[in-house]
Amino acid sequence: MTASVVRIEDKLYQNRYLVDAGRPHIKVRQHQSPSPNLLALTVVCPAKCYEVNEDGQVEVIADGCMECGTCRVLCEESGDIDWSYPRGGFGVLFKFG
């Protein structure tokens, strides 16, 4: 009997999200040019919620956020983002298995 290998993408696909429309729990603060920490978020966020737009500004789309806290830890000192937990009942719904 051989154990099949399950890809991480397949496991993450099982998660569900209840989006609180119009009330994102992460906001990028206004900036003239993105700090090194903001630019790092475009690479280190496991859910790929951060991207650089055509104007060179870092934007966040929190709908697929896994609430892991990577961005919170990275930007805590600089204050580049405002991060709070989603309202009760909203956010990621993890499905294990």
Swiss-Prot record:
One Pfam family this sequence matches: Fer4_ETF_QO
InterPro entries named among the record's database cross-references: 4Fe4S_Fe-S-bd, 4Fe4S_Fe_S_CS, ETF-QO/FixX_C, Fd_FixX
Domain 4Fe-4S ferredoxin-type: 56-86
Gene Ontology molecular-function annotations: iron ion binding; iron-sulfur cluster binding
Superkingdom to which the source organism belongs: Bacteria
An individual GO BP term: nitrogen fixation
Protein's name in the database: Ferredoxin-like protein
Family as reported in the entry's similarity comment: To ferredoxins from P.putida and C.tartarivorum, ferredoxin I from A.vinelandii, ferredoxin II from D.desulfuricans.
Record-annotated membrane-spanning stretches: none
Protein keywords: Electron transport, Iron, Iron-sulfur, Metal-binding, Nitrogen fixation, Plasmid, Transport
Organism (species): Sinorhizobium fredii (strain NBRC 101917 / NGR234)
Function, in words: Could be a 3Fe-4S cluster-containing protein.
